[in-house]
Every structure is written in structure tokens, then in C-alpha cells.
Amino acid sequence: MNPTERITTPHKTGEAKVIIFSAPSGSGKSTIINYLLAQKLNLAFSISATSRPPRGNEKHGVEYFFLSPDEFRQRIANNEFLEYEEVYTDRFYGTLKAQVEKQLAAGQNVVFDVDVVGGCNIKKYYGERALSLFIQPPCIDELRRRLIGRGTDTPEVIESRIAKAEYELSFAPKFDKVIINDDLETAKAHALKVIKEFLGIDTE
């Protein structure tokens, strides 16, 4: 199954905003997001739903909303997701509309870390209320070097991630802003500036 392409009626313009991050694995996206969440920007991370079991000390409603595969399918049928993906049989990930609306209603600017298709879907749903950012590695060779440097994946997994990254990079023009992460501190500063401008915060 491919990620859903279903788009529902956009939300009316409000004060709180939506900030979407997508990127290939190894681009430094998570590091940049964690840096931004630590700034005083009233940002709140969007908690995804998943049908996989909790790992270790993971708690429902903290790391993820844990649903059974049948519960996930029922919520899909009820059109409760902004976006979702079945990565393989019975292993779903997605973003629940009600949770995001709850955060926005509380005045929080909601940050998403999603795949490129999910990012495009959320941007379509929220329109001008959303800023979509694509974090891009300087080149595929550098991405391969970073993935090898992690020391967590087999060569086969790394090549699979590289192939996926080449597909994901083709989506970059669909995003509002592309931030090239060839230097992490520069990329963090660039992302901070772009988000402050979007939120109407003085960047001086």
C-alpha cells in the first residue's frame, strides 16, 4: 500500500502554525529539529500513531500513540489521519488529525517529522498555515559516508537507504524551503531564521 493521497478540507487560518520537516535518512534532520524544539518558539512535536508494539520504556501518548493493526485500519476507514503509511504488512505509521488539532487549539506551533509524501499531504491540508522544509544532504556520496559513519546499518541496508534517498530528493522542489546541510551549525541557523520569519518573530 502506498501512503494515502486522501486530502480533506483545509483547516481555517488560525494563530498557531504547522512546520513540516522531511529528509532522507542521514541528512541531520532529527538533530536540527531537536535544536529548534529547544528554542523559545512555542514549538510542540507531533506525536505519530503506530501499529507496532512499544519498545523498551516507550509510553502511549509520549513517543507514539500505540494502536493495534485493526484499530489503525478502523481509524483509516473513519478518515482520522492527516497522512499514513503501511511500511509493510500490518506495520502502520500515521498522524492523527484530532491530536494535531488539539495542539493547535492550545496555541502550539506543531512540528512534523514525516516522509516526503506525508509532508506534501500535510502541506496540502493546511495550505498557507504550514511551512514545509526539506533538509538535503550536500550530495549522495556525503549521505553514504554519514550512514556508514553511524555504524548501525549493514552495507545492504545503507544501499537501500541511498536508493530511497534518491527517490526522496526528487520531492525537494515541492517543499517551501530547501535547507542544504553541508555544515550543521549553518543549517541550524538557516532553519531557525526561516521558521522565525514564518512565525513572525523578529530575526534580528
UniProtKB/Swiss-Prot annotation:
Keyword terms of this UniProt record: ATP-binding, Cytoplasm, Kinase, Nucleotide-binding, Transferase
Domain Guanylate kinase-like span(s) in chain numbering: 16-196
Localization: Cytoplasm
Cellular component, GO annotation: cytosol
Coiled coil: none
Catalytic activity entry: GMP + ATP = GDP + ADP
Keyword Oxidoreductase assigned: no
Residues that hold ATP according to the record: A23, P24, S25, G26, S27, G28, K29, S30
Pfam family, one: Guanylate_kin
CDD domains the UniProt entry points to: GMPK
Family to which this protein belongs: Belongs to the guanylate kinase family.
Protein task: Essential for recycling GMP and indirectly, cGMP.
PANTHER family assigned: GUANYLATE KINASE, GUANYLATE KINASE-RELATED
Official protein name in the record: Guanylate kinase
Protein source organism: Bacteroides fragilis (strain ATCC 25285 / DSM 2151 / CCUG 4856 / JCM 11019 / LMG 10263 / NCTC 9343 / Onslow / VPI 2553 / EN-2)
Species classification: Bacteria, Pseudomonadati, Bacteroidota, Bacteroidia, Bacteroidales
Gene encoding the protein: gmk
